[in-house]
Amino acid sequence: MADIKALVEELSKLTVLEAAELAKALEEEWGVSAAAAVAVAGPAGGGDAAAPAEEKDEFDVILTGDGGKKIQVIKEVRAITGLGLTEAKGLVEGAPKPIKEGVNKAEAEEIKGKIEAAGGTVELK
């Protein structure tokens, strides 16, 4: 164990150039490639691509635009979020921006309906 710690300390002292040279020398000595090790690992996750997606239970409500009715959308954003006029205006003008995050499906659909009724466009993620 002490040998490993000493080796780690010595390797930590190497410059980037020296570390690259070391990697190349080890690749040649052992007949391996660092890039090949990554390719062999394969994709992460390992889930079945054909498996049905689980239904989400939390959504982010993203304002994507004001639809030309900025004032009505700002009023609705203020009512939904409790933000002040300046903050709500900044949110609407800075779209796409999240209005609410981590809400249940029913609340997300309700918010979407209110914003769309005011003239805005919304995306649920």
Swiss-Prot record:
**Biological process according to GO:** translation
What domain of life is recorded for the organism? Bacteria
Please provide the record's keywords in A-Z order: Ribonucleoprotein, Ribosomal protein
Record CDD domains: Ribosomal_L7_L12 (cd00387)
What GO cellular component term, any one, is given?
cytosolic large ribosomal subunit
Q: Which GO terms describe its molecular function?
A: mRNA binding; structural constituent of ribosome
The record's similarity note reads:
Belongs to the bacterial ribosomal protein bL12 family.
Query: Subunit structure of this entry?
Result: Homodimer. Part of the ribosomal stalk of the 50S ribosomal subunit. Forms a multimeric L10(L12)X complex, where L10 forms an elongated spine to which 2 to 4 L12 dimers bind in a sequential fashion. Binds GTP-bound translation factors.
Enumerate the NCBIfam families for this protein.
L12
Job of this protein: Forms part of the ribosomal stalk which helps the ribosome interact with GTP-bound translation factors. Is thus essential for accurate translation.
* Protein name (record): Large ribosomal subunit protein bL12
Supply the source organism for this entry. Erythrobacter litoralis (strain HTCC2594)
